[in-house]
């Protein structure tokens, strides 16, 4: 991944590469840019807001994990705080294609897990597929969301998805990323399970009530969480494992370093992620233990 970032730097305009290199090559770079850093880059490069976001896409695509398609897609969302979050597509050998994560989903869930309660705009390499348009329509900010493509004028999400079907059609008022804090607790004192409960309390599952969260522990002790992101159209829903795996990659870590996983689900939910979680992790590494709790 670092080599891909270095390649992106080599291909970027000199003024951008010079200013960006110390940021993206730093050991603590977390695939985000603060509003202040973005403003500094605008000033140093004389690029417009749109031009700079498009120029940053190769750096987001550097995080892509696409062993099947070898098609590397990047996306960048701007949270309500003004911070920019990178995302990239993610695929898995030996697992059915429904487990794939698109770049738009990656960037959005990245922002969500880092505390954003909505996104203002999204910048992507290629026109969003129907799956992602539907996924974005679940967002708390869907009505205001702007979509930017290279060499295109900015458009609203609903210009890409007219006459959209969404949460309101099913009587749901709260969207994905809306500020929420469920009150689930678990008697099991295992630290990884407690981290999964924290993720569960962020989750969005108004259609099945399968509020759920997952935590992954790496060999170096780092822990990454994923909350379930359900969708009114069902199929574009993003499972908690995928949300957590996205955080692993965007932190510059690898799947090889996953040491353990914990999944916590609402006992009153109408579905379960357990079987798919186990099968996907087994494809990555059959030795990863999975703890599971219903609360």
Curated annotation (Swiss-Prot):
The lineage of its organism: Bacteria, Pseudomonadati, Pseudomonadota, Gammaproteobacteria, Vibrionales. One of its GO terms (biological process) is cytidine deamination. Binds 1 zinc ion. Substrate binds at residues 89-91. The gene is cdd. GO terms for cellular component: cytosol. Keywords: Hydrolase, Metal-binding, Zinc. Belongs to the cytidine and deoxycytidylate deaminase family. This is Cytidine deaminase. Zn(2+) binds at residues 102, 129, 132. One of its GO terms (molecular function) is identical protein binding. It comes from Vibrio parahaemolyticus serotype O3:K6 (strain RIMD 2210633). Disulfide bonds: none annotated. This enzyme scavenges exogenous and endogenous cytidine and 2'-deoxycytidine for UMP synthesis.
